[in-house]
């Protein structure tokens, strides 16, 4: 797969990765290498639905400077994910619906 030089938004659902709403790639799983590639872009939006994204996979996004909108729906995140989001200075929208292992004990990491 030939990755584009830049991307601003990422959406993954049902094995299809869409960059900037138009560039489509068949990506059946989000490997650590793919997540690193995506975290290397100057993204403002990232959304994954129906993939077991873990806290470890998410770690590559820690400190992402331009991220405004981030969502992982029906993933495998836990309360340990919140420090990754607290290190995103421009983050304004966070959607974590369907991550059954999130109970709220990590929310204090977002206060600041």
Please report, for each region that a protein language model flagged, where it lies by residue.
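Concave beta-strand-loop units of leucine-rich repeat
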Residues: 4-112
């Amino acid at each position: 797969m030939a990755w584009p030089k830049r991307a601003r938004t990422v959406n993954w659902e049902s094995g299809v990765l869409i960059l900037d709403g138009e560039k489509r790639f068949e990506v059946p799983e989000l490997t650590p290498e793919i997540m690193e590639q995506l975290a290397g872009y100057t993204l403002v939006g990232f959304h994954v639905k129906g993939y077991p994204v873990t806290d470890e996979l998410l770690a590559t996004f820690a400190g992402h400077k331009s991220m405004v909108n981030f969502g992982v729906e029906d993933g495998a995140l836990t309360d340990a994910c919140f420090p990754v989001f607290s290190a995103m200075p421009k983050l304004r929208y966070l959607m974590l619906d369907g991550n059954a292992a999130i109970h709220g004990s990590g929310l204090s990491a977002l206060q600041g």
